[in-house]
């Protein structure tokens, strides 16, 4: 059994979860268990962070996929809904947080793994999803003087 703080391989992580983890957000992956894969490494694609001595995690969510129509996913709002209207992973986690904050449900539990290096992860434990928000990032273009 993997315990918080254990450093494990990608294969061990997938074996423990019983699935081949491919995306960062996995809402109710198996039953009521959700899984988040995060990275705090330099040049990580998302601005995930840890606050309050490891008691609070801020997870940025999923960008849209890079396509010919969206060559720079960071300039497109992270979608809450799929084209067919169902909730995306962003939408599912957001809804769960809002249902908790409005006292409609207990907080969702999420297992968090943090990428240390290619193929090497640390299990950070189980966290409660207690809040979610959307915020606008501005992209600044600078030209040399």
Regions found by a protein language model. Name each.
Residues 1-122:
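Acidic, glycine-rich low-complexity segments with interspersed aromatic residues
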Residues 116-145:
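Compact mixed alphabeta submodule
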């Amino acid at each position: 059994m993997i315990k918080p703080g254990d450093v494990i391989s990608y294969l061990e992580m997938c074996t423990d979860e019983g699935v081949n983890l491919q995306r960062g957000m996995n809402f109710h992956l198996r039953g009521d268990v959700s899984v988040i894969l995060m990275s705090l490494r330099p040049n990580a694609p998302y601005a995930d962070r840890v606050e309050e001595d490891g008691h609070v995690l801020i997870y940025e969510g999923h960008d849209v996929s890079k396509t010919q129509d969206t060559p720079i996913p960071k300039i497109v709002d992270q979608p809450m809904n799929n084209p067919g209207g169902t909730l995306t992973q962003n939408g599912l986690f957001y809804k769960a947080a809002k249902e908790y904050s409005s006292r409609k449900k207990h907080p969702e539990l999420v297992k968090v793994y943090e990428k240390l290096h290619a193929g090497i992860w640390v299990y950070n434990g189980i966290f409660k999803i207690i809040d979610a928000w959307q915020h606008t990032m501005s992209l600044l273009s600078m030209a040399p003087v």
